[in-house]
Amino acid sequence: TLSIFLDLGGSVNLDEFKTDNITAVEVHEDADIKKNKLLKSIFPDIARKLKFNEEGVELFIKVTNDINDHNKKDQEKVADVFTPKKPIITYALIIINLFVFFFPTFMGNFDEVTAYLGSFGPFVKMGQYYRLLTAAFVHANIAHLLFNMYALWIIGMQLESFIGKWRFLVVYLFSAICGSLLSVAVTPNALSVGASGAIFGLLGALLYFGYHYRIYLGTVIKSQIIPLIVINLLLGFMVPGIDNAAHIGGLIGGCLMMIGVGVKYKSSNFERINGLIVSLIFFCFLVYMALFA
């Protein structure tokens, strides 16, 4: 976003507007615009667009109206992205996870469901590829389930509202599969269950989304999301029984697929295509490492 301040009375102090996410550039004449590398890199055609036929008051009115129109459109886009929406997919995923845990528990065959749906390297290599996805809906115990569902509710309801239902679902499922694949590659003889790989994927997607909207989410990303990821990964290395490979695979997969599905109003088609290509390469690499290496 380019904001222009007119210093008509010598009262504009640019230092007031400088933050980690905002760069203030002082311009006295047209030549200053052409010399500034930052402006030229972000707005390569700004010099051409600043050429007007109007002069004096007419030029001032035209520039003011253009800026107001542009800011209004930007505000409408931001409102569209950040206005809360009902997180239907998040609720559906939570319900499925609860059903998969409690129904077989009440029926007395919980261990069988875990054995049939969990990710286990030898069975996956025998052709039971469905386990790579179904493992994300199975949990070892009630504490495991409640912890993951709380995390899914907190993170999912925000991210789904930001990026939309279909993007959210694609990121979630892709992250779950990537997490299972890396888990099979690193610990092939361990039974892996849980939604944490997919949830880490949501965190990876939130990182990329937050980068594009860093003027609004920059502080949250740096003070909350990144520390949360780092702390949980460190715990995964220190506490036995945690499948950190699934966490890392999901985190990377979620970030890459978020690039592929794109951030509304921010991502170009070029970025989306590159994101999908890199996601496919990463997926193929994981398949090779898990099934053929």
Where do the protein language model's features map onto the residues?
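N-terminal TM1-TM2 helical hairpin plus the immediately adjacent luminal interfacial "cap"
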Residues: 87-196, 237-242
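Alpha-helical membrane-inserting segments
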Residues: 99, 103, 178, 182, ...
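Alpha-helical transmembrane segments that form the membrane-embedded catalytic/substrate-binding core
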Residues: 145-152, 193-205, 243-261
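C-terminal ends of transmembrane helices
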Residues: 152-160, 207-215, 259-265
